[in-house]
C-alpha cells in the first residue's frame, strides 16, 4: 500500500508507488476524503481549490516520472476551469502541452505515454498538444480555444515558452477586447436561448442555465480581456464591481459550487444537470429536510433565487462593460421624460444619483414611464445599480407607502404594463419589494412534471398571456379569449387576480382560499370598491373551477352546466374567468394547451352563457332537444337516400341519452354506417375532421365484459392518448362507445393512420383479446411517488356511481383500470381522462352489471382491487 500522505501530496510519490493500481486508489481515497469533508461542512471553496492543487501535484510528479522535463522548450499548462484553479469532483482536467516547435518523434512518444497513463487512471483529461503558433492560429478562429488560453496557468516546464504564449495572447491583434466582448455576448445569448431565456427549468443546468456559473465566468472573461482583471476581487479594484456586488457574486458562486459539488459526489459520470433523479439526494447532502418533497423544494427555491441574482448582476455588469468597451467616448442622445428620468439611447435612467433611496415611490414612476413609452427597452446600468441598492436598503415594503400604492394602481391600469413593465419589475425584484406575499413565492417550485415554472415565473407568464388576447394574430389559437378580453372594461381587475391566484402556494392549506383572503386585503388597502373586491377575490378563489369542470366533469350533462352557471352567476364573471383560466393553463406548461382543451372550455363557456341568458330557473326541455337533433340528422340521411322508415327502426334501438349526447351531425355519421353494416361484426369509425378538438373513435359491437379494456389497450399500443370516453349501450345490448383521442403531441390523428387503427381494433374485438405490449415507463416517472387514490363522490340523482381515481400515469394505465372493471363486474358509463404531469386524475361514471349504482361493499371491493393493480411494485 502507498503512504497515506500521498493523498494530500502526490508530489512525494516514490517511483515504486507510481502504478496504475496505486494511483487509482489514491484518487479514490482523495475523492472519498473530499466527500466526507463536504458532508462535514468544510467550505466548498477550500475543497475546489484543494482538488485543483492535488491534481497539480499529481501531474507535476508524473511529468517528472516520464522525464518530459528533460526537454527544455516544452511546458505543461492548465487551461479552462482547471486553469482558473476550479476543479469539482467530476470536472474535466484540461491541459495544454505547449512547445516552441513541433515535438520530435521521441518527445511525442514520451508525451503520449504520459497522456495514456492519465487516461488509465480514469482521469477525465481534455488535452491538446500545440506549438505557440498553433495556439494563436487556432485561437483566432475558435472562441472557446481563445477563452481557454486567457485562463492558462503553467504547472511545470519551460517558463520562457509559457511567457512567450502569454505575450502573443495579450497582443492587440489576438482577439481585441471589442471583438472578444461582442463574441462572448453572442455566445451567452445563444446559450440562454437553449434554456428558453429563463432561470426556471425543471431540470436546470448548474453551469449553463441563465444565471448559472457560466454567467459568472463570462463576466470574468470579459474583465480579464479588457481590464486585465484576473479575479472577481480585481474587478472590484478596477471599479467595475462595487464591494457589495463583489460579495454578492462570491456568495452566489459559493452557493452554486456547493450544489454542484453535492451533485458530483452523487454521480459516476460528469453532468451538471439537476435531474429529478438526483434532486432528492443533492438536497439531502446539502442538509435540506422536510416532509415528502419539502427538502427538494426548499433547495430548488434557494437555487432559483441564486440564479436570479447572478443573472441580474450579469446583465447589469455586461451593460457597464458595453459602455466602457464599445461606447467609450461616444455621445448618446438623451430625451427628458420628467425631472427624475430621461431616456439615453433606448434605456431609461434616473437623473439623480440617490433618487430611489430618497423617494422609494419613484421606483414605480420609472416603470410607469416604461409602460407608457414603447421606445424604452430596459434600464440603464447605473440606474439599475441604484435600484438594487435602494431595494436592499428598504426598511418597509413599498405597498406600505401611500404614494406607491397610487402609482401601482396607475401602473396596472396601463394597457402596455402587461407586455413589458411587469416582466422587468419581476426580473429586478420590484414586485417582491412591493408585495411581501410575492417575495414568498419567488423561486417556489413543485417537485412534479406538471408545473414547468416556479410560482412567480408562472404568474408573470400568465399576466403576459392575458396581453396576448389583445392581439388578433392569436385569434386562431384563442378564439374566445381574443373576442372576450378586448371588451373587458376593467382589465386591471383581471391583472390583480392573476398576481394573487397562486400567491399562497407553499404555505400548506388550500392556496385558492388563502389567496382570496390576501387578494381581499390588497383590494381594501388599495381603495377598490366592494364589487371590484368581491370579483377579484372570487376569481382567485375559483381560478381552477372552469378548468376542473371542463376536464373532469360531464359538461354535456345539463345538471353539470347548471351547477357551474349557478357558481358563476353572471356573464361578466364568466368572461373574466375564461380569460384567467386559459392564460393560467398556457402559463403552467406550454404543452398543455391543445385543440381538445380549447374545445372543452369553449363548449362549457357557450353552454353556460346560454344557461345564464335563459335564466337559471328555466331548464331546457329534454324532449325538445332530442326531437330537434333527430329532425336535423334525419334530413341529412334522407338527402343521402335513406328511407325514413329504416332510420326510425334503427333509432328505436337507442336510448334517449344517445340523442342528447351527440350532435345531429354525429347521429347522421353513425347511422349512415350502421344502416349498411353487418351487425355480427365490429364497426369502428374514426372522424376525418377534428371533433371537439380531437379524433373521435366510435365503437359499435355486441357488448362484452372486457370490451373497454381491449379498446383502450389497442389505442395505447398505437401510441394514442384517450382524453374522454362516452360509454353507452343500445336497448338490445350493443355498444355505442365514443373515445376522444389525440396523438402524443396533443394533435388529431392524421387520416393516413385511420385504416391501421381501425383494423387493429376490429381484429382485437373479433378475438376479444388484446396482446399486451409492455412499455417502459419514461425515465422521469421513475422518480415520482404518486399514491393511488380512489374516491367515490356523491351524486344528486343517486342513479349512478361517480368515482375519481388518482394514480401514477404509467403506460397502459387505462387498460389495467378496464381489466379491473371487467373482473369486478362494473360497467363504465363515461370517463374523463386528465393527465397532470406525472399524475393521472381520472373521473368515471359507473353502474353494476344490472345497471344500478354500486353498493358500499362493491365500492370498497373495487377500490381495493384498483389500488392493488395500480400501485407500482418495487
UniProtKB/Swiss-Prot annotation:
Keywords carried by this UniProt record: Hydrolase, Magnesium, Multifunctional enzyme, Nucleotidyltransferase, Repeat, Transferase
Cofactor(s) of this protein: Mg(2+)
A GO molecular-function annotation: phosphoric diester hydrolase activity
E.C. code: 2.7.7.59, 3.1.4.-
UniProt keyword annotation of Transferase present: yes
InterPro entries: ACT-like_dom_sf (IPR045865), ACT_dom (IPR002912), HD/PDEase_dom (IPR003607), HD_domain (IPR006674), NT_sf (IPR043519), PII_UdlTrfase/GS_AdlTrfase (IPR013546), Polymerase_NTP_transf_dom (IPR002934), UTase/UR (IPR010043)
Pfam families: ACT (PF01842), GlnD_UR_UTase (PF08335), HD (PF01966), NTP_transf_2 (PF01909)
Family (UniProt): Belongs to the GlnD family.
Name of the molecule in the record: Bifunctional uridylyltransferase/uridylyl-removing enzyme
Amino acid at each position: 500500500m502507498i503512504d497515506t500522505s500521498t493523498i494530500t501530496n502526490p508530489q512525494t510519490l516514490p517511483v515504486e508507488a507510481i502504478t496504475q493500481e496505486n494511483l487509482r486508489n489514491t484518487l479514490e481515497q482523495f475523492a472519498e476524503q473530499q466527500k466526507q469533508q463536504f458532508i462535514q461542512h468544510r467550505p466548498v471553496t477550500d475543497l475546489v481549490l484543494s482538488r485543483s492543487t492535488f491534481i497539480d501535484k499529481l501531474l507535476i510528479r508524473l511529468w517528472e516520472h516520464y522525464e518530459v522535463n528533460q526537454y527544455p522548450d516544452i511546458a505543461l499548462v492548465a487551461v479552462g476551469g482547471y486553469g482558473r484553479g476550479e476543479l469539482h469532483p467530476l470536472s474535466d482536467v484540461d491541459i495544454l502541452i505547449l512547445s516552441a516547435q513541433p515535438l520530435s518523434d521521441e518527445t511525442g512518444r514520451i508525451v503520449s505515454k504520459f497522456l495514456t497513463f492519465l487516461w488509465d487512471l480514469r482521469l477525465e483529461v481534455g488535452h491538446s498538444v500545440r506549438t505557440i503558433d498553433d495556439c494563436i492560429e487556432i485561437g483566432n478562429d475558435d472562441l472557446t480555444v481563445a477563452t481557454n488560453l486567457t485562463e492558462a496557468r503553467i504547472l511545470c516546464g519551460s517558463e520562457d515558452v509559457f511567457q512567450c504564449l502569454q505575450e502573443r495572447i495579450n497582443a492587440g491583434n489576438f482577439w481585441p477586447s471589442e471583438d472578444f466582448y461582442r463574441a462572448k455576448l453572442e455566445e451567452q445569448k445563444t446559450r440562454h436561448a437553449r434554456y428558453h431565456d429563463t432561470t426556471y427549468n425543471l431540470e436546470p443546468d448548474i453551469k449553463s442555465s441563465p444565471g448559472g456559473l457560466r454567467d459568472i465566468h463570462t463576466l470574468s472573461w470579459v474583465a480579464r480581456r479588457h481590464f486585465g482583471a484576473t479575479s472577481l476581487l480585481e474587478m472590484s479594484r478596477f471599479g467595475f464591481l462595487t464591494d457589495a456586488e463583489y460579495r454578492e457574486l462570491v456568495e452566489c458562486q459559493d452557493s452554486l459550487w456547493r450544489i454542484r459539488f453535492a451533485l458530483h459526489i452523487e454521480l459516476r459520470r460528469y453532468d451538471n444537470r439537476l435531474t429529478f433523479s438526483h434532486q432528492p439526494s443533492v438536497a439531502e447532502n446539502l442538509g435540506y429536510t422536510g416532509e415528502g418533497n419539502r427538502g427538494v423544494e426548499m433547495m430548488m427555491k434557494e437555487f432559483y433565487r441564486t440564479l436570479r441574482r447572478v443573472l441580474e448582476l450579469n446583465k447589469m455588469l455586461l451593460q457597464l462593460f458595453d459602455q466602457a468597451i464599445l461606447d467609450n467616448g461616444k455621445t448618446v442622445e438623451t430625451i427628458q421624460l420628467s425631472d427624475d428620468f430621461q431616456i439615453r439611447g433606448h434605456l431609461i435612467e434616473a437623473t439623480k444619483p440617490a433618487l430611489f433611496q430618497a423617494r422609494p415611490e419613484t421606483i414605480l414612476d420609472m416603470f410607469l414611464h416604461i409602460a407608457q413609452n414603447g421606445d424604452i427597452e430596459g434600464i440603464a446600468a447605473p440606474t439599475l445599480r441604484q435600484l438594487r441598492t435602494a431595494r436592499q436598503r428598504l426598511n418597509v415594503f413599498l405597498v406600505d407607502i401611500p404614494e406607491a400604492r397610487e402609482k401601482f394602481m396607475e401602473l396596472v391600469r396601463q394597457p402596455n404594463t402587461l407586455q413589458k413593465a411587469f416582466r422587468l419589475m419581476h426580473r429586478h425584484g420590484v414586485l417582491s419589494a412591493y408585495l411581501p406575499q410575492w417575495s414568498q413565492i419567488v423561486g417556489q417550485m413543485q417537485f412534479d412534471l406538471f408545473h414547468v415554472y416556479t410560482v412567480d415565473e408562472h404568474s408573470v407568464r400568465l399576466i403576459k398571456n392575458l396581453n396576448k388576447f389583445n392581439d388578433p394574430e392569436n385569434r386562431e389559437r384563442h378564439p374566445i379569449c381574443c373576442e372576450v378580453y378586448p371588451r373587458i372594461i376593467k382589465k386591471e381587475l383581471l391583472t390583480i387576480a392573476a398576481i394573487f391566484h397562486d400567491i399562497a402556494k407553499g404555505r400548506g392549506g388550500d392556496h385558492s382560499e388563502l389567496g382570496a383572503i390576501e387578494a381581499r386585503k390588497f383590494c381594501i388597502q388599495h381603495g377598490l370598491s366592494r364589487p371590484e373586491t368581491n370579483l377579484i377575490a372570487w376569481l382567485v378563489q375559483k381560478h381552477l373551477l372552469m378548468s376542473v369542470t371542463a376536464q373532469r366533469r360531464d359538461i354535456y350533462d345539463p345538471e353539470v352546466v347548471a351547477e357551474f352557471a349557478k357558481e358563476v352567476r353572471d356573464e361578466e364573471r364568466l368572461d373574466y374567468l375564461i380569460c384567467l383560466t386559459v392564460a393560467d393553463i398556457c402559463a403552467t406548461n406550454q404543452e398543455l394547451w391543445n385543440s381538445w382543451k380549447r374545445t372543452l372550455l369553449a363548449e362549457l363557456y357557450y353552454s353556460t352563457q346560454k344557461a345564464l341568458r335563459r335564466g337559471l330557473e328555466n331548464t331546457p326541455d329534454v324532449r325538445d332537444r332530442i326531437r330537434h337533433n333527430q329532425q336535423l340528422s334525419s334530413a341529412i340521411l334522407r338527402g343521402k337516400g335513406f328511407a325514413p322508415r329504416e332510420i326510425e327502426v334503427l333509432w328505436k334501438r337507442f336510448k334517449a341519452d344517445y340523442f342528447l349526447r351527440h350532435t345531429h351531425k354525429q347521429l347522421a355519421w353513425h347511422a349512415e354506417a350502421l344502416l349498411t353494416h353487418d351487425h355480427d361484426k365490429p364497426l369502428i369509425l374514426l372522424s376525418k375532421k377534428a371533433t371537439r378538438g380531437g379524433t373521435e373513435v366510435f365503437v359499435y359491437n355486441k357488448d362484452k365484459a372486457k370490451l373497454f379494456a381491449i379498446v383502450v389497450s389497442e389505442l395505447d399500443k398505437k401510441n394514442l392518448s384517450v382524453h374522454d370516453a362516452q360509454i353507452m349501450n343500445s336497448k338490445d345490448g350493443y355498444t355505442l362507445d365514443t373515445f376522444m383521442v389525440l396523438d402524443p403531441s396533443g394533435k388529431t390523428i392524421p387520416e393516413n393512420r385511420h385504416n391501421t387503427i381501425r383494423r387493429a381494433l376490429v381484429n382485437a374485438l373479433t378475438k376479444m383479446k388484446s396482446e399486451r405490449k409492455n412499455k417502459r415507463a419514461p425515465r422521469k416517472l421513475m422518480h415520482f411517488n404518486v399514491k393511488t387514490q380512489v374516491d367515490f363522490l356523491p351524486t344528486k340523482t343517486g342513479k349512478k356511481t361517480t368515482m375519481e381515481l388518482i394514480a401514477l400515469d404509467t403506460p397502459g394505465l387505462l387498460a389495467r383500470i378496464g381489466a379491473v372493471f371487467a373482473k369486478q363486474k362494473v360497467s363504465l358509463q363515461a370517463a374523463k381522462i386528465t393527465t397532470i404531469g406525472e399524475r393521472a386524475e381520472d373521473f368515471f361514471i359507473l353502474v353494476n352489471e344490472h345497471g344500478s349504482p354500486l353498493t358500499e361493499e362493491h365500492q370498497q371491493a373495487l377500490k381495493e382491487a384498483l389500488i392493488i393493480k395500480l400501485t407500482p411494485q418495487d
